[in-house]
């Protein structure tokens, strides 16, 4: 064969020099040409054809100049001979890697520096000095910018193969890799050492979650305990307390040990990260809280303060989550069985009502004006029936609402339409159920051979929902029927806190489901004369293994709880199609005023108002209920059209009032409303208030009702002079308040006063109340309200449609106060029903209430 063929084949080994056709590298034609041209002085691929022929390659300057190794070292993602992309770890990559094993440049191989080429022989001419090697190392550039490959300059994916190879190669550079380096700015890059990645478990060879936080914390611990000042030239505590959210890690962990101080996710006491944080932050700050966390004990004054107000940390004054780590710690160390809360003690401050509350005694970020917490608490706030720690059973004996009914001046059990008569009935139900023994699985309604099957004479399912069912039951030894609602324990925390109930309505400490607590509060609100438009409950019990009858869902055996309540004749969806306009008007007014009483006392966000969740009782028609709004002195006269409507189902509620102590979200407060006149009616409803918009500097990001982070407040809200005018010149911010975060408002906001500082999220509940009658989209849940009611075009229906068509972004932002009808249920009632300002002639008063 002519030499020119070999030269041509050497220049372009991808084509046959005789035919000009493309040939496959490694194929039969390629191998034949390789053998044919291997006898001459010109070698095609000495490193590929003759393995290890370094001397021959060095002897041929022309071939050495055409070596692919320099280009391969610069860019290992492309074949230096063809220019085509190659897969890292593929056959071509491995062939080039073997061919360039003796190349003196940086190798693209992904191996640890400690194990890279242990038996490699390096030519003396190619040996580098330590200074040259340090200068050629990619580690300094990788430490400065870990998002780029220092050899190619291309962007690399954090955690990808190239990144991990460089991380392994530079493991000893600066003692820490860039992702966990103390000089990396976590706040600017958005990264955190408290991130988890999936790794292979060496023992099981299966994906197992490991916590890089523990490794990084262990490294920081070495620096914290090091005696050498030359090895570490920075303060590692400042690294731990880097600006990730408001405050440092140790400050946030000391303030709330129940949550990860960086991510905000719940943190268990058994979590290894909790142990590491305790070890690192045990000396910072040096406060009684950290002393108690590290096991140095709790003094008597601290226990006394905790027993007086178990909703606040007695050391820091901040809110404590019920059954959280701090709560359990103080409950275990403090015996509160012999300590009773004195009269006039406020739950918000833990001080006596007679002694003024100073600004220094208030917990940080409470946003309350001085003296706001010194007022006497409402009965439902001070009761704490289901939240008093340190006792073996939190509901032993009679609930607090039983003692509340006897204190009312108009307490009359002889009138079947009075709340007192209804309370006496549920009291008898509770007393009877406490004598009934539980079944094998506890107080169950649907388990095999369950409690109801053996004790009840009749059991009829009258309603089904997504998470439970409602039964109308009749017991052998009780004269009347009543309702039992079986609900599934949904939240993980409730399942974790679950403990069986041996006696009806007698719960172990910390095991009461949230809905049971809310129902007890609602019953107490009715018992204290605030509203008759809510259902009354008679206690609850737990079930180990129920088989609930759910709506459109396959039932599984799980843990449940049962609640007993007074019987109703039907839900609103059954009777609404046959209601007259006067009956529907009375029903809507009852629901709105019942909602207002809950907004005032609990700061409730119901989130599930619909016709199916409104219970209706038949009552003899005639008379009226007198309801007084204590905020503006407005008096409503609700005519009795033969139906008593009760707002029920509190399974997904949120209670944003801090004094209640059941939520970390305190709601959106965008203005202060101060009444300057008695409440007005019709189109003038709400204009009796002086409106002062609120601005804040910090925005708390809440998605899905959960805290995400904080950022500068840039959420703009435009205010109008009236509800029908155009947008004015007043521009403010959207102000979301969250427990423990100071959003820096421009005025003192009393979060417990939901009348002066209404919760903007209440617009959804008001809209759902009205849309239940006039139709429309559900505000708090997916779907639409089915139009059961047959509209007639009456005046109140047109006013209700105005409220129902509110804009969720702009409605309510009016300087004259007319937009309050979208937020406050009582103002909406005054706008829709101006005729209820006076009673009907000749009608008698059934009962009076003040909300």
From Swiss-Prot:
EC number: 2.7.11.1
Residues that, per the record, bind ATP: 462-470, 485
Recorded catalytic activity of this chain's protein: L-seryl-[protein] + ATP = O-phospho-L-seryl-[protein] + ADP + H(+); L-threonyl-[protein] + ATP = O-phospho-L-threonyl-[protein] + ADP + H(+)
Keyword Heme: no
Record's keyword terms, sorted: ATP-binding, Kinase, Nucleotide-binding, Serine/threonine-protein kinase, Transferase
Ranges for region Disordered: 1-24, 61-91, 104-160, 190-216, 340-400
Biased composition, class Basic residues, residue ranges: 196-216
Domain Protein kinase: 456-851
Composition skew (Low complexity), residue ranges: 125-141, 340-366
GO molecular function: ATP binding; protein serine kinase activity; protein serine/threonine kinase activity
PROSITE patterns: PROTEIN_KINASE_ATP, PROTEIN_KINASE_DOM, PROTEIN_KINASE_ST
Active-site residues annotated for this sequence: 608 (proton acceptor)
Entry similarity comment: Belongs to the protein kinase superfamily. Ser/Thr protein kinase family.
Protein name: Putative serine/threonine-protein kinase 019R
Organism: Frog virus 3 (isolate Goorha)
């Amino acid at each position: 064969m002519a030499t020119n063929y070999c030269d041509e084949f050497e220049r372009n080994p991808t084509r046959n020099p005789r035919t000009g056709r493309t040939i496959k590298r490694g194929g039969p034609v390629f191998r034949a040409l390789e053998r044919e041209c291997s006898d001459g002085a010109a070698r095609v691929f000495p490193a590929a054809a003759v393995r290890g022929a370094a001397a021959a390659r060095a002897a041929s300057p022309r071939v050495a100049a055409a070596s692919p190794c320099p280009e391969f070292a610069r860019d290992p993602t492309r074949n230096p001979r063809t220019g085509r992309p190659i897969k890292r770890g593929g056959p071509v990559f491995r062939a080039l890697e073997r061919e360039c094993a003796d190349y003196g440049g940086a190798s693209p191989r992904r191996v640890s520096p400690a194990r890279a080429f242990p038996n490699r022989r390096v030519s003396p001419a190619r040996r580098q000095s330590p200074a040259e090697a340090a200068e050629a190392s990619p580690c300094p550039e990788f430490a400065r910018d870990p998002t780029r490959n220092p050899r190619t300059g291309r962007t690399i994916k954090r955690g990808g193969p190239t990144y991990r190879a460089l991380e392994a190669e530079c493991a000893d550079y600066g003692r820490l890799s860039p992702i966990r380096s103390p000089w990396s700015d976590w706040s600017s890059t958005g990264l955190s050492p408290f991130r988890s990645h999936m790794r292979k478990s060496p023992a099981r060879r299966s994906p197992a979650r490991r916590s890089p936080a523990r490794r990084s914390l262990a490294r920081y611990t070495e620096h914290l305990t090091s005696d050498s000042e030359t090895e570490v030239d920075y303060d590692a505590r400042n690294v731990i307390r880097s600006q990730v959210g408001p405050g440092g890690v140790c400050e946030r962990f000391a303030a709330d040990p129940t949550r990860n101080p960086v991510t905000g996710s719940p943190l268990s006491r058994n979590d290894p990260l909790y142990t590491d944080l305790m070890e690192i932050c045990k000396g910072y700050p040096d406060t009684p809280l950290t002393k108690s966390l590290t096991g140095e004990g709790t003094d008597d004054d601290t226990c006394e303060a905790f027993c007086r107000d178990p909703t606040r940390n007695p050391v820091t004054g901040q809110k404590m989550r019920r059954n959280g780590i701090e709560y359990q710690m103080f409950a275990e160390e403090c015996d509160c069985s012999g300590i009773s809360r004195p009269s006039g003690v406020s739950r918000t401050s833990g001080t006596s009502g007679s002694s003024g509350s100073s600004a220094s005694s208030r917990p940080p970020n409470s946003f309350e004006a001085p003296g706001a917490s010194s007022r006497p608490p409402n009965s439902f706030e001070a009761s704490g029936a289901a939240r008093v720690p340190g006792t073996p059973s939190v509901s032993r004996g009679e609930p607090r609402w039983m003692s509340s009914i006897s204190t009312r001046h108009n307490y009359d059990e002889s009138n079947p339409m009075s709340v007192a008569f209804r309370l006496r009935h549920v009291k008898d139900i509770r007393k009877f159920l406490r004598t009934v023994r539980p079944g094998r699985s506890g107080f169950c309604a649907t388990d095999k051979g369950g409690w109801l099957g053996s004790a009840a004479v009749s059991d009829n399912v009258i309603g089904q929902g997504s998470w439970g069912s409602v039964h109308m039951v009749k017991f052998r030894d009780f004269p009347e029927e009543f309702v039992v609602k079986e609900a599934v324990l949904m939240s993980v925390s409730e399942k974790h806190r679950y403990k069986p109930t041996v006696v009806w309505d007698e719960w172990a400490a910390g095991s009461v489901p949230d809905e049971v607590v809310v129902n007890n509060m609602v019953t107490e609100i009715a018992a204290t004369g605030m509203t008759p438009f809510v259902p009354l409950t008679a206690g609850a019990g737990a079930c180990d293994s129920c088989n609930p009858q759910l709506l459109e869902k396959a039932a599984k055996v799980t843990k449940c709880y049962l609640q007993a309540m007074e019987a109703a004749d039907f839900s609103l969806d059954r009777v609404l199609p046959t209601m007259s306009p006067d009956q529907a008007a009375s029903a809507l007014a009852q629901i709105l005023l019942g909602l207002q009483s809950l907004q005032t006392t609990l700061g409730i966000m119901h989130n599930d108002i619909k016709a199916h969740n409104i219970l209706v009782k038949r009552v003899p028609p005639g008379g009226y209920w007198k309801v007084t709004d204590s905020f503006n002195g407005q008096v409503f006269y609700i005519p009795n059209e033969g139906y008593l409507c009760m707002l029920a189902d509190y399974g997904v509620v949120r209670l944003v009032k801090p004094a209640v102590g059941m939520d970390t979200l305190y709601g959106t407060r965008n203005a202060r409303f101060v009444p300057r006149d008695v409440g007005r009616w019709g189109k003038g409803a709400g204009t009796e208030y002086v409106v002062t918009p609120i601005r804040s500097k910090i925005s708390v990001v809440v998605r899905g009702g959960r805290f995400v982070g904080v950022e500068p407040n840039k959420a703009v809200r435009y205010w109008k002079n009236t509800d029908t005018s155009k947008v004015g010149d007043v521009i403010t911010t959207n102000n979301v308040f969250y427990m423990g975060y100071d959003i820096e408002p421009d005025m003192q906001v009393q979060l417990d006063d939901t009348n002066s500082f209404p919760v903007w999220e209440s617009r959804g509940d008001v809209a759902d109340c009205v849309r239940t009658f006039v139709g429309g989209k559900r505000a708090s849940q997916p779907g639409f309200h089915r139009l059961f009611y047959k509209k007639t075009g009456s005046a109140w229906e047109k006013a209700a449609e105005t409220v129902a068509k509110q804009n969720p972004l702009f409605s309510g932002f009016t300087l004259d106060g007319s937009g309050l009808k979208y937020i406050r249920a009582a103002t909406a009632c005054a706008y829709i029903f101006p005729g209820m300002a006076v009673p009907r002639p000749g009608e008698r008063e059934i009962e009076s209430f003040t909300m």
